[in-house]
Amino acid sequence: PLKRIRDGPICQCFTDADMYITASVQEQENNSSTIKSNRTMSNEIFVAFATQKGGIGKSTVTALAASYLHNVQGHNVAVIDCDAPQHSIHGLRERETKLIDESLYFKALACDHFRKIKKNAYPVIASDALNALDDAERMLAEEDAKPDIVFFDMPGTLKSNGVVKTLSQMDYIFAPMSADRFVVESTLQFAVMFRDNLMT
């Protein structure tokens, strides 16, 4: 099991997650998924941080995981921001880009960083849950550096159009939660719904 953040440094938590995902890449070729899948993709791993509870930190954890795996661990990643209309991660990327464009200091820092990691920033695509899979397929067909992992930042409700369909195509779904009774109950309901309706 993954270590909790309070049990050790946050980097250790992401290192454990990285080791788990890396090991699962090899297993994926030998084991068929238990999720009902319509995907015809090859090696990319689709990952979503999702619950039916809003404001639990899905966008934050998605951005942290994508940035750590891309910038520190060297994986090629991409993010499909399906959390319309706020598009928190896409908005953050636009603000970062504007800041770099307007400041020679930050431009120099960015150039130095990308030179060190020998790659550009990972792509962030603004989408919605209904069109997320099509946008991911289009992005994968166009990208020169094919992502190893594609993260999907999902809306905070299962009632949004396309959420269940998109989640049904994930290789891994992580459900962030806090130590709160209502959050835990909501997350358990989400897991039961997923098990009963989308697992074969």
What is each residue range found by the language model?
Residues 39-75:
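Walker A (P-loop) phosphate-binding motif
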Residues 63, 67-71, 94, 168, ...:
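Short, well-ordered alpha-helices that flank and scaffold nucleotide-derived cofactor binding pockets
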Residues 5, 9-50:
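Extreme N-terminal, non-catalytic leader segments
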Residues 78, 155-200:
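Conserved catalytic-core segment of NTP-binding enzymes
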Residues 50-56, 71-150:
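P-loop/Walker-type NTP enzyme "switch/lid" segment
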